[in-house]
């Protein structure tokens, strides 16, 4: 049984509906091996849970991609001008569908209303938890592919530190990283890169601009790639430009210790809120609790932000196969910010840190 058929089988057995209708492209890739960006056109994977038969509905212009990559039983192309929902409902009728499972977090309102033309709201259910639970667990092959993505990311960052950053703008550094990532085989960037220097580094999700890196700055770089396997990476390092001041040293070391504590707490069976607490307590003790304004981490895989969510309210335990980030931060408006982010694989025998790029303050101080 292929990995895709195995995933379909697990989903079919975990939901209590006749038919699953998936429309999110990454979810469809997860269950078929076929990735299409449909834009405004309808892309859908239809899974008959009674016999696990799969049908992919797609824009006819993507026929070649589907033929080459999709591991599904039936193909249902639609041309511009055709009503894809007519074809969809015919497929549902063929499978004697009485109840439908959808991605409640993705299916747009207009398409949901189309479903209501034929089905009562009481027969439509969200299957997001089941899909997210499956995507949240990775195997050894997934782990190896994620490692390749992280290795490319770290190689580009090493090139940047060798080339030097002083006098370069945030945009110039972001462009440098994009070029290096492409040269090492990245399909695309997974976001950004976020390159923020000086006071801008206090913006957790700021955008790079024309501000140039100067002596005395924090330089925060958060970036990642989409690899050939479509797994993504996500890492953050914060550099200090020139000799650190006492305040910079204090803030950086507080975040570094919180990162270390979060990693040490992240073992299978540990409630996720305890991982958040382990890191957060150290930042609070250092006097910066009010400046750590987000959760400790999130899941990572084919999507940049997947389940699970490592926040202070999540009492679910970490499971073997989870891939998560640990990314504490301190952000002081008018001064600057520090975030350090690693990606981890939760294993049976221990936790694997995908990242090897240095974090010690002496190793992240740049003089050029």
Regions found by a protein language model. Give the residues of each.
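Active-site neighborhoods and metal-handling regions in enzymes and metal-associated proteins
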Residues: 1-368
């Amino acid at each position: 049984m292929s990995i895709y058929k195995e995933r379909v089988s697990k989903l079919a057995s975990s939901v209590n509906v006749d038919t699953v209708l998936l429309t999110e492209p990454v979810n469809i890739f997860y269950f078929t091996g076929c990735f299409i960006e449909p834009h405004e056109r309808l892309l859908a994977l239809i899974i008959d849970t009674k016999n696990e038969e799969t049908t992919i509905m797609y824009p006819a212009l993507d026929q070649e991609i589907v033929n080459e990559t999709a591991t599904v039983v039936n193909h249902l192309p639609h041309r511009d001008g055709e009503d894809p929902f007519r074809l969809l409902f015919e497929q549902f009728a063929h499978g004697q569908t009485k109840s439908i499972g959808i991605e409640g977090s993705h299916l747009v309102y207009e398409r949901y209303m189309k479903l209501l033309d034929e089905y009562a709201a009481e027969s439509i259910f969200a299957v997001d938890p089941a899909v997210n639970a499956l995507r949240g667990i990775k195997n050894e092959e997934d782990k190896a592919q994620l490692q390749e993505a992280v290795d490319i990311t770290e190689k580009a960052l090493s090139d940047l530190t060798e080339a030097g950053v002083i006098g370069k703008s945030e945009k110039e550094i972001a462009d440098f990283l994009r070029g290096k990532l492409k040269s090492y085989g990245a399909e695309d960037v997974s976001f950004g890169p976020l390159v923020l220097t000086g006071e801008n580094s206090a913006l957790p999700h700021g955008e790079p601009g024309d501000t140039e890196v100067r002596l005395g700055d924090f330089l925060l770089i958060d970036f990642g790639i989409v690899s050939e396997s479509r797994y993504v990476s996500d890492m953050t390092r914060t550099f200090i430009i020139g000799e650190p001041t006492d305040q910079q040293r204090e803030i950086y070391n507080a975040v570094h210790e919180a990162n270390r504590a979060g990693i040490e707490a992240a073992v299978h069976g540990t409630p996720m809120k305890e991982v958040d607490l382990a890191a957060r307590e150290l930042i609070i003790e250092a006097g910066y609790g009010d400046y750590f304004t987000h959760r400790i981490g999130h899941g990572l895989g084919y999507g940049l932000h997947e389940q699970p969510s490592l926040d202070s309210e999540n009492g679910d335990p970490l499971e073997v196969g989870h891939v998560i980030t640990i990314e504490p931060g301190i952000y002081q408006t008018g001064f600057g910010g520090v975030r350090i982010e690693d990606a981890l694989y939760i294993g049976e025998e221990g936790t694997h840190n995908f990242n090897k790029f240095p974090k010690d303050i002496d190793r992240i101080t740049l003089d050029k």
